[in-house]
Amino acid sequence: MARFVPVPGHAAVAHLSARPLTPVLGTLPPQDMEVLRCASLDARLLVNILGNLQPADTLRSAEGRMRAIAAALPCRGVLLASTALWVHVGGPPPDSLEVSLPGGRRSRLPYLVTRRGRLPHCDTTVIGGITCATIARAAVDIARLGTPVQAVQAILTARDHGVSRVRLLLTLNHCRGAASRGCPRAQHIIESLAFHK
């Protein structure tokens, strides 16, 4: 026969009250996503990044955006071009990751676009422990290799985030050898746009 043990009221209420919640800082586990599915809220609260749903509010900082793609990055890869620009300034998430791998390695992953070559140390920065091209280098690479619309948008984005014309031209000057493809077009775009003084 079960024995009744008297319990103080405050102990019972403390047991039933909600425990402190830990914020979601990354990809939610599948079991949590199945419970939380609500079509009208998903579009407002979650962003699809390379097939993983990420909480939208964690993507407001460069560190949060880097954390969102860190699991998909290969070891010692350096983020380049549109992916690096997205990490720095935000906007629509990338469909693929552009990276430079040491030793010219290639990847078979469908979402990974690899480039050969090394970036000069002055054209890289570290965000959240991962090496990434600077805003200036990312914009210059898009201006060299992207479509005309992407090229102009990248330079305008860099300008709007405080990168000067001189900085962009100096960064463009670092593009040597095979990395010099598209330099005349990028230089023309940089010199054609009005910059803040």
Residues covered by each model-derived region:
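Short gly/ser-rich loop at a beta-strand->alpha-helix junction or flexible surface loop bordering the NTP-binding
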Residues: 1-197
